[in-house]
């Protein structure tokens, strides 16, 4: 079941983030600085943007679903968005799954939830980005009919701030 994450679940959220950071460290510099940190995730929770995949009461995976124009997406290179970034985009950030639950299609279920969420909110463009070395995330996006749109550069300071940008128009 996927539902909104509550403040009482922040310790479980941070465990999932720690798992993701360890995994990503093996393949790239993604999430290796102080991001995402507890403040970012608490903001997601307080803004009702953080959703979790729960199984038998255990939080297994998370994603932030944010309806707004993302500043990082304004300067796309080597391609273009199908729909120009706007306040009516659904932007997916911070998808992560507990280590013991990889290869169980949890990421796919989170993406499918995001698509259904966008449809319920009458949003027609879903945007997301990932690191070029995050092959698993790229596969999940392509398997769910997202198309590669180009390259964006994150505004926050990070050693490797280049990201692959994907979009699904519904």
Regions found by a protein language model. Name each.
Residues 21-40:
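Conserved GNAT-fold acetyl-CoA-binding loop/helix
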Residues 111, 118-130:
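Conserved GNAT acetyl-CoA-binding A-motif
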Residues 64-94, 102:
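Conserved acyl-donor/pantetheine-binding loop and adjacent beta-alpha core of acyl/acetyltransferases
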Residues 49-67:
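Conserved beta-hairpin
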Residues 129, 142-162:
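Conserved catalytic-core motifs of GNAT/GCN5-like acyltransferases
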Residues 94-97, 103-116, 139-143:
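Conserved acetyl-CoA-binding loop-helix of GNAT-fold acetyltransferases
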Residues 1-15:
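A short beta-loop-alpha structural element at the N-terminal edge
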């Amino acid at each position: 079941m996927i539902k909104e994450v509550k403040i009482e679940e922040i310790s479980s959220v941070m465990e999932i983030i720690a798992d993701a950071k360890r995994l990503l460290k093996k393949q790239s510099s993604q999430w290796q600085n102080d991001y995402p940190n507890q403040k970012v995730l608490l903001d997601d929770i307080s803004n009702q943007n953080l959703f979790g995949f729960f199984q038998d009461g255990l939080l297994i995976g998370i994603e932030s679903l944010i309806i707004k124009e993302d500043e990082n997406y304004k300067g796309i290179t080597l391609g273009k968005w199908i729909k120009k970034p706007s306040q009516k985009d659904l932007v997916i950030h911070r998808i992560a799954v507990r280590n013991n639950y990889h290869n169980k299609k949890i990421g796919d279920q989170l993406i499918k939830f995001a698509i259904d969420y966008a449809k319920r909110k009458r949003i027609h463009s879903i945007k997301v980005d990932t690191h070029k070395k995050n092959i698993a995330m790229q596969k999940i996006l392509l398997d769910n009919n997202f198309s590669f749109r180009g390259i964006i550069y994150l505004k926050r300071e990070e050693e490797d701030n280049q990201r692959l940008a994907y979009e699904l128009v519904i």
